[in-house]
């Protein structure tokens, strides 16, 4: 029992047997926690349990949590590959008590696991405790039988953990393993504690206090336990190796890199193998959890990780994209423990392949600039911060990649200069943004929300309601009155109008009172629950305190509801046809159409398109109920509801289920109720039954970003109108083609192919005509000799530039040695000119110089190309012969007379 998968299973099994709920790893994108970029510890998903905000049906839990540290406070990126234990991705094993057991059992369980299950030798173990934690000190003596020398008191923050400036906190006890005298280092607390000999592998946090402010700390009525053990670290100990990169899992990935590149994994390029193995894990798991490479936020961190790995692939000599070819090795090692890797394998592979293909050009440009800028620097030198910033800002070359490339040359970066350039850019961005009024407006919303409280939303149950005007705004400022003809915004105490959010557009309609009529043109939602009704006063005046009646535009709301429900059906149909890697990346729900962005590495085929439509429409035809339930976020996720990654949800969420009819049983399940077709967390408005959608038809599919596709669709009457238009178009097309409608496509394809064939024949005929014939004698001949050099000149009409080039190439082959000049005149009388020089003459003649002479005669400027072939143009086609004569005269003056 010392393989990584066996160790993970043994840890969880031990705590299962000791009454702990085994909770699956949460995603790397923290749910409902905007303070974190990535999940970086096992306790992240339990934060609300520790603070008492949330309750769950268990008080003991254990997890194997996937973690990423590559951004913000916890950033290990720069060290990865160069040390024995730094990673961007790692697994943290942990056990947790939420007001259940405390120090005695926590220490007892830890000791039993490491000495009885993991069978670590007791004489190699030692622990630290916080300097005044006498209870933990005494418990270690009692349970483990440690002498005083093996229990080290530490007074620093290393042994005291806090969630923040306020909140739960408490002392820690860290467990260390002595790896022996072969490694340098001293015990914790000593001058040499940073060495590798004494390895900390498990941290027990005793949450027994609440920090209420500076110097204000009280005891918690129900203390808790939070522990974290690095899986890679304990695996290294159990496998008898001193580096995490030598454990079985990492070694398998490193050997896959070596096999793909043919480079010794234990030679001078060892660090590059390690970087790729680590970054492959981080990149793949992030993509599987819905993160895609981009230029901001989490996507940018992912891009940095991927590009650093790609840089090291280039150092290993990889001539083609490498990372995507390593994904099968990763899924073999970790797919069983984390099935999301298997579900998203196609997306991971394609995302890595596309990103690396794009980055190769960026990498080449960046490395060329680096080479030029560092050529004059000696060992220990520093690259200008301005240059490093230019690489980052202009060429998309992350700073850590620049630092990594310079590390091999023993060079550094002027970080102060880089930060100054970055600060200057931010200041310019702020300056460009200032004056928009957005910052002041946002501040105003906070003040207004605090003054008025939340707007009570009634729109799930009604489209009409009585309300009271609480505030009026115009140009972002609060006013006391709006007259007829004036535009502004109204805040009500309650409203049936849906505020734009979650991709769904805001409602429109009317707000009326005796003698007053306000047309609502849009509804926004600020700060989550403050509804702003924008529009224009059509009659009377609007004043605060006025009692009004609200009327949502029913037909528009009905169309929006249908489109929103259709996006849910479309989402699930996409997953069923394309795979479980499908994740929503954005949406628009409008009355006339819907738009759905989703993660997928390649275009949807026509066959898949049809399947997706058929599946969604089959659920619509069932006319099954659409049900909505309010439940806790935990219960919702436990029920299988899908949530958007990175979306912030409250303690209570709306769960929308479709394709579930409690009055019908599924014959295939022996009378049991069939599961819902779609279950999602959603705050939007929906139809009562799927049949209310009427019909769904996809009208387009396209790419919007790397690894992100977009489908646009219509429902109901809009869909019928679209299909009727398409049918009319097909009928008209078939009539013009004189073919049955079901054969129109085949007939059109045949005509297109026939047209292409005629175009090719016409092009060949024009080229033959342009080449002409005859000998080198006579003034009208296209071929003449000047000073012993053959010169072919020709002015033609109706020949495109691409054909001019092929004409020039053909003429060069025909004459064998010489110079070719051809001018083509279009129907608009504009001219194009091509000059070609055979290879044996390019040391004497330059096609670019000659073509520029012709361009001048044609009224053009410049010209470009190579010494053997160049092109130019001009507006004066009448001067075609003059342009050719200019080239001929230039040749005549530069060549000796025979």
UniProtKB/Swiss-Prot annotation:
Compartments, as annotated in UniProt: Cytoplasm
Keyword presence, Zinc: yes
Cofactor note: Binds 1 zinc ion per subunit.
Domain of life according to the entry: Bacteria
Keywords assigned: Aminoacyl-tRNA synthetase, ATP-binding, Cytoplasm, Ligase, Metal-binding, Nucleotide-binding, Protein biosynthesis, RNA-binding, tRNA-binding, Zinc
Main location: cytoplasm
Cofactor: Zn(2+)
A Gene Ontology term for the protein's cellular component: cytosol
Database matches in Pfam families: DHHA1, tRNA-synt_2c, tRNA_SAD
GO biological process per UniProt: alanyl-tRNA aminoacylation; negative regulation of DNA-templated transcription
GO molecular function, a single term: alanine-tRNA ligase activity
Alphabetical list of CDD domains matching this protein: AlaRS_core
EC class (word): ligase
Residues at which Zn(2+) binds: 564, 568, 682, 686
Disulfide bond residue pairs: none
EC number(s) reported in the record: 6.1.1.7
SUPFAM superfamilies: Class II aaRS and biotin synthetases (SSF55681), Putative anticodon-binding domain of alanyl-tRNA synthetase (AlaRS) (SSF101353), ThrRS/AlaRS common domain (SSF55186), Translation proteins (SSF50447)
Family per record: Belongs to the class-II aminoacyl-tRNA synthetase family.
NCBIfam families, A to Z: alaS
Domains: entry comment: Consists of three domains; the N-terminal catalytic domain, the editing domain and the C-terminal C-Ala domain. The editing domain removes incorrectly charged amino acids, while the C-Ala domain, along with tRNA(Ala), serves as a bridge to cooperatively bring together the editing and aminoacylation centers thus stimulating deacylation of misacylated tRNAs.
Its job: Catalyzes the attachment of alanine to tRNA(Ala) in a two-step reaction: alanine is first activated by ATP to form Ala-AMP and then transferred to the acceptor end of tRNA(Ala). Also edits incorrectly charged Ser-tRNA(Ala) and Gly-tRNA(Ala) via its editing domain.
Name recorded for this polypeptide: Alanine--tRNA ligase
